[in-house]
Amino acid sequence: SRGIGHATVKRFSSAGWRVITCSRHPFPEDCPWEMGEEDHIQVDLSDPKSTITAVEDIRERLKGGKLEALVNNAGISPKGENGERLSTLDTDLRTWGHVFHVNFFASVVLARGLKAELQAAQGAVVNVTSIAGARVHPFAGAAYSTSKAALAALTREMAHDFGPLGVRVNAIAPGEIETDILSPGTDKIVEKLPL
């Protein structure tokens, strides 16, 4: 609905692809995207039942057809009260679960649920991980970073499992991109970096 996801939708749409979007937000009325509202699914990826319902909705919209690409881009990185990163010492278990459901488990549910449509198209899955999954990051919290590292490992497993079906699975790991996932205090943190 914004950031990398929004840019991805714009890119695929401009290339003539039919794009079915998923977001926790309703489709914005002021969005100029012509097919947007009818091809938008509001879903809470932190809720497994909601995610499964979204898979059923996507399959219904595809009407048993093909799915050329699945881009698993959802990601959340909760911050502390003052915008600071949450570490392993101060992230409560509920937050860990919430982050992993959105950033990791939803990718499994979506890919498995859409396996037949991906196979019919000999399509591709792209999991959006993060550089934060490979190193301690000054902005990204421990749960976010760990979930993105797990998603990178999952990508290898999915490539092994989906490959024989003719479905490619890859990951991209973006670096710093100015999106809403960065906390409001990010500019102050950047000033303190010894670069």
Region annotations inferred by a language model:
Residues 130:
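Residue(s) in the substrate-gating loop at a strand-loop-helix junction
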Residues 1-20:
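Canonical Rossmann dinucleotide-binding motif of NAD(H)/NADP(H)-dependent dehydrogenases/reductases
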Residues 111, 147, 155:
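Active-site helix of classical SDR
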Residues 81-88, 92-97, 189-190:
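Substrate-binding pocket helix/loop in short-chain dehydrogenase/reductase
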Residues 31-35, 84-86, 164, 171-195:
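A glycine/serine/threonine-rich, flexible loop-to-helix segment
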